[in-house]
Amino acid sequence: MLARVPLLAGLTLLAIAIAIGSVVIGHGIRDRNRNDVITVTGSAKKRIVSDYVVWDLSVTSQQPSAADAARELAGWTASIRSFLTKQGVQPGELTVNPVSTETVGSGTIKGYRLTRSFEIRSPRVRDIATVAEHSSALLAGGVPLSADAPQYVYTKLPSLRPELLAEATRDAQHRGRVLVDATGAHLGGLRGVDVGVFQVTSPNSTQVEDYGVYDTSTVDKDVTAVVNVTFGVG
């Protein structure tokens, strides 16, 4: 009877060891399956047309006296207003800012520099672009106009993002399936998504920035979305 005790104890320990080993092996299989993943980059691009424009311009007069500079600036301001009105710019689209004044000279004042700035904001993108193209007529008429290039923006970008992200994700899934099918495996479910920044560029541009690009120089633009999607592999 006493001889059977060590035997029973040994069999019990063996059974426990087998059970523990099975658990470890089982976890190992599950971990391996959990780690069988593939991360694929997908992208989507859409051509859009800007729906808003901002155009900044200014004129500066410099004269020995403030009064002379003010008179000259007033004449040029009237010419600019008249030009913009004739070109079809609406009163609600035009902002005329107050005059800014600087003195010329260090210590002794040698003159005064007065500047008037204007800003046009409008959803009539093509019309304002045409006005900007014709603004050289002011220079030809003796008005020393200083004008920035119009800035063209797209105000509906937030509503476009979901559509592009969905398309980019489908693109990643297609790419992943092609890669995995070539190995005889099966593309599994979604494990994770990393959304990149949106790039808004001029048409067919290859410009890419880590923090995103927002080009305002062209009316037509390309919006590109990029996602990195991780799928399981079976």
Predicted feature locations:
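Short, charge-dense linear interaction motifs
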Residues: M1-G234
